């Protein structure tokens, strides 16, 4: 009984689409990361150019919303629909297994809305016995540029056609608008009269689409047996698409017999008659063509991309081609221009239009190199194609990784998404000479059109009347009538923004975090580091490197000081007023700012002593301030009046103000003016010149400073004075969002001060301070519904006990925006995003709403707290801290047992990141900053180290504290000239060689991963070069016996390699044994004090594909070819085999359950074997095997008490859980591994790692609640999974009782939740069980959606499940990853 939880989402971008989605005029970007849909908006930010003083404008991406989808996305297209909710366009999303979803943006809910979902999984379409299953077939989605219909090719030869209603469907063709975005698209405005008038005359459609229909491709043409690619074309009045296909399957091995067998045919569709017409067909095209790219005007037609050439076909069927390497002539007889000197490989390349009038296109190769594709235009046709690599002066010439998706955004920007590296937002511009030339050319075109004769104009009229006209509008495109489109070399590219990607994660290891210099000197008070850290190899080719993952924020400690009985701490930064105004000298400018650190020491129940320090560099010096809290009253809050240059201290009984030197300037007592009763302050909020204080009778005291800086009370209305409040918060609105809901203002006012009050009945009141005007009342805040508004909730049932509500900015400096953060008495954090929507038929009337953000982090239960005692009973004295600037981020800190930060970046939603450290109170005060070079976009922190090489394997050397890397780089592969069987290889005369890999073994020290200059340091470390055509297949740190006499054991680095020279040459392998030794370092580089010393080397027959330690005598288990051998290291450096087992095809995985001798052997084709190794005598025995012949990509043991499970990841993104149970009758006396469950995760697994599991806070509470010693029933192991797209998953065993609760909860959530895109999570996970004995694996990400539900629905579902809320929270905490307490 297991549960799969995705700790980190996919990071590699697979699809991208630029579309006005959030509004009709917005610039938005839809990004898909396998099964994660993200919506970004584009914002222009002023930035300083490197090496220049002037500012230049950059465009940044800001995440608006993201959705985890229950499906794998295979296609993405934009569709113009009638009367969309946002006024923008809709998006058609294609999924694996022939599903389509049409979604749009709903501004009322601030989320996507599913218009429709289309399933094409019917048996009558896929029941043919010789057709593969849908999940084994690719699909192609394309939408007509005018959004009249979409075509969806699925199941190889099925074509689904979905018509879309457009303005003028029932009118004459005079209302035709061109495909360039003119005409039809202008009628999408909801307020426009054109659409309304047409709706009155025509039909009002209930849906934006008409019924779809499915046709076999053979009905279009019987010869379409092997479709390759298709796309809708521009400049046609009727929906018209071009399809690339062949009558026989293309094959490189059968090239002499199947040369130039590809056809390109253009069909036009008649949607009413469900018929098609062939417009043109081109035969005998190169057989390596794989994609059709429709080209907009001025070029038009289609560009066909092959592995060695580019072919352009216009609307009349005229062809132009260019070969980009020397093989283009050998693989095809098609006529093409020769540019073989470029030596380009076009496999899986990306081509994107640059969007200008020249028709140039950007070509991105799999290496990341970029080139420009230019079309020579001769009148109204293309007369030639040329390809030009970007020169060095173009600024950016490569993105260093293959692009998986691209989209033209407009305004000189292109987005390139990648699965192998970071995705980039590129900007391009022209030099001044190019701009001037384009203007002259445009002017020439206009002049030519003005001087055109009547006969020429009549010819143009003929083209306009032609149904399939190839004449574009010259005045619209500004295209020159002839000549090359533009002079080459005038493009300048630069990167505006990046989306970080840590995929593919190729290998993973765990190592100890080495001590810092402060810790080595004995100052352990500075240590906040974890025991272990996870280091993974990530990226491909030149974007490769390492990534260090941490479960919590590991702060960089700058200094520390020991203070006894410290209770709270504050900081205050002041600027001397007279120096700020008149200070001009350098000396005065340096002394104008002073930063104080104020700590309080507990002296008694109601007494505190204030300790004051002044910051001097990285040191703290005591500062004497006799006026500062001389009565030792309890401090509630300390803040700074920025504009008044005062420090304000809120005590229980009074408010004290201090000047620059902390001399007392004012005392304001806290009492009730109506009754003259003395009151005490319990919380306070300070913002600039305003101070809001909540007293012990739940009344509000509001103070505001005058021009002199003195505080005076400001009386609000009677509703505020008589109200009872739980929490108060002041917020300075920098964006003008809250002022926009005031209908009396013509435009929003920025930097207005607002007061937020949470009443006892949990209504949120929003006041503007300057005129005490009530702008909005948010009802039912304690209901925690997904959407908060001024309307009362429909169902008023169970409520959450809220103790605090604040409004604060979250995000980076340029993207900080307000968020409402609610805190419950159990430390649950609920985050809402405020937004303003238009209400009513009259424009200008807006209402304020709050949209709930996803938060899957559960608070820890403090030690010593029982389940019946609320953990937040004393948290009023520990309020949330608003941090306006912490390392460039605006964040909120939560103290207490679950101490951490609420952080939001431009690429992430607000999320909670825990602060590392024990919960126990200590006398040490540490002064820290956020760790440098660290990303906070996810639930775990990520620190990347760029190496510029692909790292395939890595291991941690426990004896030296070094990381050993197996890297590779691309090299040319040449046939061996010394082969006696093939003497003809010596006469090979080619210059364009195939690509192979050259491997190195390198060392990296942990300190290099922590330093900011690690990129430079790594290349000074020791490396060991392997032979030609020799690849690193495995690296392991193994404790080997190094002496046969003394039986001494040492930790050695064992490396397995393979010599691969082609399919027809048998592969060989080699086993290397290294020891990391200490040497005399280079004086200029003291970090080079380690070296790899070769201890042993053993060449073997067959590739060494996997390694593992086995047994207790220091032996290594080696998978070599079709055998698995146990070898021991001899003193002469050879490795002697002592036991072996014959395998079948290709051993992909070898794992041992440490110290037991039990091992699993995974075959890439024949499944997994469970074997055992015995030492007396040396023997390997087969215990059981899998009879389903799984394609094993990764495998690992998973012990659960007395049961032994084996987790297997196959090549179809599935997880299989097998069990070895010889007592089960179905196991055939233990010879068969029993299949217990199957779970589809949607990602290709790269590694599975068995890790120990620690107790979570809820389990610690249960174990400590009873004084008797009880057995720990919690599981002791879990499996960490890495994937090719950068995601990180965790498989956890759960007890029977918890499984029943969570299984029932999963069924309830599947049936009751509204799932994005209308998908079914149960169908996506496709859980299969082995009869009645098997239990399906649970989906942890679906279970965590219970946390984000409203309080009423959570209680209802918990009641249906038959569990209490704290029990479900405890179960969710166990599967959340908190069991990795040592990380």
UniProtKB/Swiss-Prot annotation:
Highest taxon in the source lineage: Eukaryota
Acidic residues: compositionally biased ranges: 448-467
Keyword set includes RNA-binding: yes
GO cellular component: nucleus
Gene3D superfamilies linked: YVTN repeat-like/Quinoprotein amine dehydrogenase
Compartment annotation: Nucleus
Keyword RNA-binding: yes
GO molecular function: RNA binding
Family: Belongs to the CFT1 family.
Protein's recorded name: Protein cft1
């Amino acid at each position: 009984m297991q549960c799969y939880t995705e700790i980190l989402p996919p990071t590699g971008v697979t699809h991208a689409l630029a579309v006005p989605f959030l509004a009709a005029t917005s610039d938005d970007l839809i990004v898909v990361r396998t099964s994660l849909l993200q919506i970004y908006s584009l914002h222009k930010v002023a930035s300083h150019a490197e090496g220049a003083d002037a500012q230049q404008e950059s465009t940044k991406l800001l995440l608006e919303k993201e959705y985890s989808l229950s499906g794998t996305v295979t296609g993405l297209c934009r569709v113009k629909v009638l009367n969309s909710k946002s006024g923008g366009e809709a998006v058609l999303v294609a999924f694996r297994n022939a599903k389509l979803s049409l979604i749009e943006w709903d501004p009322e809910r601030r989320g996507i809305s599913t218009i429709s979902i289309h399933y094409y999984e019917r048996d009558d379409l896929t029941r043919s016995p010789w057709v593969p299953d849908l999940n084994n077939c690719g699909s192609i989605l394309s939408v007509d540029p005018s959004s009249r219909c979409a075509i969806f090719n699925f199941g190889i030869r099925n074509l689904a056609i979905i018509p879309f209603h457009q303005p003028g469907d029932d009118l004459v063709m005079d209302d035709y608008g061109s495909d360039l975005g003119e005409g039809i698209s202008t009628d999408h405005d909801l307020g426009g009269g054109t659409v309304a008038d047409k709706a009155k005359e025509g039909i009002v459609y209930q849906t934006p689409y008409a019924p779809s229909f499915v046709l076999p491709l053979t009905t279009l043409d019987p010869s379409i047996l092997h479709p390759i690619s298709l796309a809708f074309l521009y400049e046609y009045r009727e929906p018209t698409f071009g399809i690339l296909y062949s009558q026989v399957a293309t094959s490189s091995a059968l090239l002499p017999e199947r040369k130039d067998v590809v056809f390109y045919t253009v069909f036009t569709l008649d949607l009413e008659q469900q018929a098609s017409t062939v417009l043109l067909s081109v035969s005998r095209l190169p057989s390596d063509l794989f994609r059709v790219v429709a080209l907009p005007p001025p070029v038009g037609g289609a560009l066909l991309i092959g592995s060695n050439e580019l072919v352009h076909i216009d609307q009349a069927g005229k062809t132009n081609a260019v070969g980009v390497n020397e093989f283009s002539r050998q693989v095809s007889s098609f006529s093409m221009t020769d540019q073989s000197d470029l030596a380009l490989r076009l496999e899986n390349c990306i081509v994107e239009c640059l969007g200008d009038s020249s028709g140039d296109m950007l070509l991105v190769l799999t290496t990341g190199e970029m080139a420009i594709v230019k079309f020579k235009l001769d009148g109204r046709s293309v007369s030639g194609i040329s390809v030009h690599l970007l020169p060095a002066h173009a600024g950016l010439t490569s993105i260093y990784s293959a692009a998986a998706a691209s989209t033209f955004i407009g305004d000189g920007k292109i987005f390139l998404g990648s699965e192998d590296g970071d995705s980039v937002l590129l900007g391009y511009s022209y030099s001044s000479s190019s701009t001037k030339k384009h203007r002259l050319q445009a002017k020439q075109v206009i002049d030519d059109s003005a001087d055109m004769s009547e006969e020429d104009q009549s010819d143009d009229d003929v083209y306009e009347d032609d149904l399939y006209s190839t004449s574009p509008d010259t005045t619209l495109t500004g295209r020159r009538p002839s000549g090359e489109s533009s002079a080459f070399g005038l493009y300048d590219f630069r990167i505006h923004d990046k989306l970080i990607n840590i995929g593919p994660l190729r290998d993973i290891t765990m190592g100890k975090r080495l001590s810092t210099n402060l810790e080595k000197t004995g100052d352990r008070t500075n240590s906040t580091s974890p025991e272990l850290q996870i280091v993974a190899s990530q990226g491909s080719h030149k974007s490769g490197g390492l990534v260090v993952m941490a479960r919590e924020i590991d702060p960089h400690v700058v200094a520390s000081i020991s203070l006894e009985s410290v209770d709270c701490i504050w900081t205050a930064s002041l600027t001397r007023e007279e120096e700020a105004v008149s200070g001009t000298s350098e000396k005065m400018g340096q002394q104008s700012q002073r930063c104080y650190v104020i700590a309080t020491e507990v002296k008694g129940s109601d007494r505190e002593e204030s300790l004051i320090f002044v910051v001097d560099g990285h040191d703290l010096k005591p500062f004497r301030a006799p006026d500062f809290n001389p009565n030792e009253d309890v401090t509630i809050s300390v803040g700074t009046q920025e504009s008044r240059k005062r420090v304000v201290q809120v005590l229980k009984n009074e408010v004290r103000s201090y000047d620059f030197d902390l001399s007392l300037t004012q005392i304001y007592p806290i009492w009730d003016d109506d009754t003259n009763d003395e009151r005490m302050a319990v919380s306070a909020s300070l913002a600039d010149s305003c101070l809001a204080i909540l007293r012990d009778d739940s009344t509000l005291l509001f103070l505001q400073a005058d021009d002199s800086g003195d505080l005076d009370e400001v009386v609000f209305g009677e509703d505020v004075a008589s109200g009872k409040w739980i929490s108060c918060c002041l917020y300075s609105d920098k964006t003008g969002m809250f002022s926009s809901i005031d209908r009396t203002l013509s435009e929003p006012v920025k930097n207005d001060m607002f007061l937020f009050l949470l009443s006892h009945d949990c209504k949120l009141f929003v006041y503007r301070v300057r005129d005490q005007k009530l702008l909005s009342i948010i009802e039912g805040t304690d209901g925690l519904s997904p959407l908060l508004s001024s309307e009362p909730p429909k169902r008023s049932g169970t409520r959450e006990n809220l103790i605090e509500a604040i409004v604060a900015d979250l995000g980076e400096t340029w993207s900080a925006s307000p968020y409402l953060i609610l805190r419950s008495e159990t430390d649950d954090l609920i985050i809402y995003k405020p937004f303003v929507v238009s209400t009513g038929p009259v424009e200008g009337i807006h209402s304020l709403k709050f949209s709930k953000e996803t938060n899957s982090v559960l608070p820890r239960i403090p030690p010593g707290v029982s389940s019946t005692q609320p953990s937040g009973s004393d948290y009023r004295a520990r309020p949330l801290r608003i941090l306006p600037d912490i390392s460039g981020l605006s964040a909120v800190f939560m103290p207490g047992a679950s101490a951490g930060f609420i952080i939001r970046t431009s690429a992430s939603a607000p999320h909670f990141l825990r602060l590392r450290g024990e919960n126990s109170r200590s006398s040490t005060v540490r002064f820290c900053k956020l760790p440098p070079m660290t990303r906070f976009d996810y639930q775990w922190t990520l620190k990347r180290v760029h190496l510029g090489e692909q790292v395939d394997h890595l291991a941690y050397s426990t004896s030296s504290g070094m990381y050993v890397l197996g890297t590779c780089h691309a090299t040319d592969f040449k046939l061996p000239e010394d082969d006696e069987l093939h003497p003809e290889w010596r006469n090979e005369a080619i210059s364009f060689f195939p690509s192979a890999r050259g491997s190195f073994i390198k060392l990296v020290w942990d300190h290099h991963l922590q330093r900011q200059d690690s990129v430079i340091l790594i290349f000074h470390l020791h490396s060991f070069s392997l032979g030609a055509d020799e690849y690193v297949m495995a690296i392991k740190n193994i404790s080997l016996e190094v002496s046969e006499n003394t039986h001494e054991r040492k930790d050695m680095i064992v490396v397995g390699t393979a010599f691969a020279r082609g399919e027809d040459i048998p592969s060989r392998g080699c086993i290397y044994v290294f020891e990391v030794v200490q040497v005399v370092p280079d004086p200029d580089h003291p970090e080079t004090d380690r070296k790899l010393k070769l201890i042993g080397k053993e060449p073997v027959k067959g590739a060494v594909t996997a390694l593992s330690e086995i047994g207790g005598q220091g032996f290594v288990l080696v998978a070599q070819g079709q055998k698995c051998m146990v070898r021991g290291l001899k003193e002469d450096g050879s490795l002697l085999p002592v036991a072996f087992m014959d395998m079948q095809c290709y051993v992909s995985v070898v794992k041992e359950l440490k110290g037991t001798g039990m091992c699993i052997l995974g075959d890439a084709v024949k499944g997994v074997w469970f074997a055992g190794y015995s030492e007396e005598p040396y023997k390997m025995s087969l215990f059981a095997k899998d009879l389903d012949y799984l394609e094993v990509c990764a495998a690992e043991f998973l012990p659960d008490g007395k049961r032994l499970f084996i987790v297997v990841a196959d090549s179809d993104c599935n997880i299989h859980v097998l069990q070895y149970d010889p007592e089960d009758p179905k196991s055939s006396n233990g010879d068969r591994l029993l299949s217990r469950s199957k779970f589809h995760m949607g990602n290709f697994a790269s590694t599975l790692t068995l890790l120990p599991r620690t107790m979570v806070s809820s389990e610690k509470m249960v174990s400590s609640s009873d004084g008797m010693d009880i057995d720990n029933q919690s599981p002791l192991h879990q499996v960490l999974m890495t994937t090719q797209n950068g995601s990180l998953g965790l498989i956890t065993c759960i007890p029977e009782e918890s499984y029943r609760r969570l299984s029932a909860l999963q069924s309830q959530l599947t049936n009751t939740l509204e799932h994005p895109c209308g998908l079914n999570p149960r169908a996506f996970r496709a859980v299969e069980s082995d009869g009645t004995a098997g239990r399906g694996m649970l989906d942890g990400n679906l279970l965590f959606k219970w946390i984000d539900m409203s309080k009423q629905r959570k209680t209802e579902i918990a009641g249906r499940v038959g569990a209490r809320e704290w029990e479900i929270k405890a179960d969710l905490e166990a599967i959340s990853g908190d069991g990795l307490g040592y990380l």
